[in-house]
């Protein structure tokens, strides 16, 4: 019997999912992206070579793994084909092992134009999107007007739908945002070229996944972003436009909940987020700068600096509940090397002194909250590239043990560096 494992981020994204997915694919035959778009970058470092994947599942770097982009992903054909060619330039045979859902909504140039125009228009109130058209594409999907991958292969139908959509979106672009219109003919020509390149790779992904399941193959579902960017459960409105929680596997890949065997939650040993929004444990002092520098905390896609702060157990507890997480993988422990004191947020305190054990549901409700910290001693020894738990400094082990105690869940994996081998596996999710 094969196992079906979900890997997802438990914070605000950028937790190091790509490396862990790549590592786990040594035991998987199939890897699936089930939500998001090319706004999230998964960074892999193998034998000193860094690769950033945005749409293509991280399993593509393993020669015997079949990779799927499922219906929950909003797909930019331009971004996907660019990524394919980049990987092919590095000698990776992508097209024979990549399959794309016919039901993926398309991200087209007008989505990108709308995304950028809105952010500019909002000024200081901007959400801080990546400007890649993700939100507007999901809007079209929910409004039942989206063009999907399958539409590309029906020229007349596609042209008619595109004409109607462009009339609508160009009106908003030109009349409200005072931006140039997107040209119909050039977009139609480009779309037909995309269709020919994508045609050999498309399929009914859900049906394919169930065939793999029936054959007893191991399937790994690769999440993008993190729990607190979820459109429903995140720090709304400072969120992404998709569901990033485990339930998105069910809708975004057509895979029933009873088939999921294990959920691995990825968390940094501290906390980061990109863009605006609440961040209770954010550090604006020299310690925060030190963590950012040591952790090289810059967005893989945008290059934007990440905000850094202490580990927030309040947020993690809720992530565990929302996703029925089986075990944790803690990443970037080595970034904390050399700090005298470490802090873990175990609760929040409001302006009246009331102690809150759960995070609020709306971003504005974080404004008057302060974290309640538990302090632990740091360590001066290096944890970089350690591969055996007993070789970690005693205080590092104590820090991890305390996280387990507070959260009531085991740490099953630990990442001590960017390379595949810089990992401690205490429990293999596929075993």
UniProtKB/Swiss-Prot annotation:
Pathway entry: Purine metabolism; AMP biosynthesis via de novo pathway; AMP from IMP: step 1/2
SMART domains named in the record: Adenylsucc_synt
Binding positions for substrate per the UniProt entry: 300-306
Pfam hit, one: Adenylsucc_synt
EC number(s) stated in the UniProt entry for this protein: 6.3.4.4
Binding site for IMP: 14-17, 39-42, 130, 144, 225, 240, 304
One GO BP: IMP metabolic process
A GO MF term: GTP binding
Subcellular location: Cytoplasm
Listed cofactors: Mg(2+)
Binding site for Mg(2+): 14, 41
Main location: cytoplasm
UniProt keyword annotations, A-Z: Cytoplasm, GTP-binding, Ligase, Magnesium, Metal-binding, Nucleotide-binding, Purine biosynthesis
PANTHER family reported in the protein's UniProt record: ADENYLOSUCCINATE SYNTHETASE (PTHR11846:SF0)
Subunit-level organization: Homodimer.
Identification of the protein by name: Adenylosuccinate synthetase
């Amino acid at each position: 019997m094969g196992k079906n494992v979900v890997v997802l981020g438990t914070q605000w994204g950028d937790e190091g999912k790509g490396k862990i997915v790549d590592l786990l694919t040594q035991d998987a035959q199939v890897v699936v992206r089930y939500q998001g778009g090319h706004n999230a970058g998964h960074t892999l470092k193998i034998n000193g070579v860094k690769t950033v994947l945005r749409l293509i599942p991280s399993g593509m770097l393993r020669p015997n793994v079949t990779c799927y982009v499922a219906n929950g992903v909003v797909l930019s054909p331009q971004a996907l084909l660019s990524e394919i060619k980049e990987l092919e330039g590095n000698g990776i045979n992508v097209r024979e092992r990549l399959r794309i859902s016919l039901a993926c909504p398309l991200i087209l140039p007008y989505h990108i134009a709308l995304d950028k125009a809105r952010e500019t228009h909002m000024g200081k109130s901007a959400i801080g999107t990546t400007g890649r058209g993700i939100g507007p594409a999901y809007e079209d999907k929910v409004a039942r007007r989206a063009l999907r991958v399958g539409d590309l292969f029906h020229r007349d139908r596609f042209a008619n739908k595109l004409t109607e959509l462009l009339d609508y979106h160009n009106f908003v672009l030109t009349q409200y945002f005072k931006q140039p219109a997107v040209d119909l003919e050039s977009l139609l020509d480009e779309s037909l070229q995309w269709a020919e390149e994508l045609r050999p790779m498309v399929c009914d992904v859900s049906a394919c996944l169930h065939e793999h399941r029936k054959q007893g193959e191991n399937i790994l579902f690769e999440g993008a972003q993190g729990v607190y960017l979820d459109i429903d459960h995140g720090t709304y409105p400072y969120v992404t436009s998709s569901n990033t929680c485990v339930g998105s596997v069910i809708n975004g890949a057509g895979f029933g909940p009873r088939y999921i065997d294990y959920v691995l939650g990825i968390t940094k040993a501290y906390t980061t987020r990109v863009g605006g929004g609440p961040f209770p444990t954010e550090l604006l002092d020299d310690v925060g700068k030190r963590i950012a520098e040591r952790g090289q905390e810059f967005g893989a896609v945008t290059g934007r600096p990440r905000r850094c702060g202490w580990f927030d157990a309040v947020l993690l507890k809720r992530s565990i509940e929302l996703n029925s997480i089986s075990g944790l993988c803690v990443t970037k422990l080595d970034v904390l090397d050399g700090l005298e004191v470490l802090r873990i947020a175990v609760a929040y305190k409001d302006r009246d002194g009331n102690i809150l054990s759960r995070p609020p549901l709306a971003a504005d409700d974080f404004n008057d909250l302060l974290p309640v910290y538990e302090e632990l001693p740091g360590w001066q020894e290096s944890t970089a590239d350690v591969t055996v738990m007993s070789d970690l400094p005693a205080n590092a082990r104590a820090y991890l043990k305390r996280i387990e105690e507070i959260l009531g869940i085991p740490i099953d994996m630990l990442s001590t560096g960017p390379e595949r081998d810089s990992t401690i596996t205490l429990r293999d999710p596929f075993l």
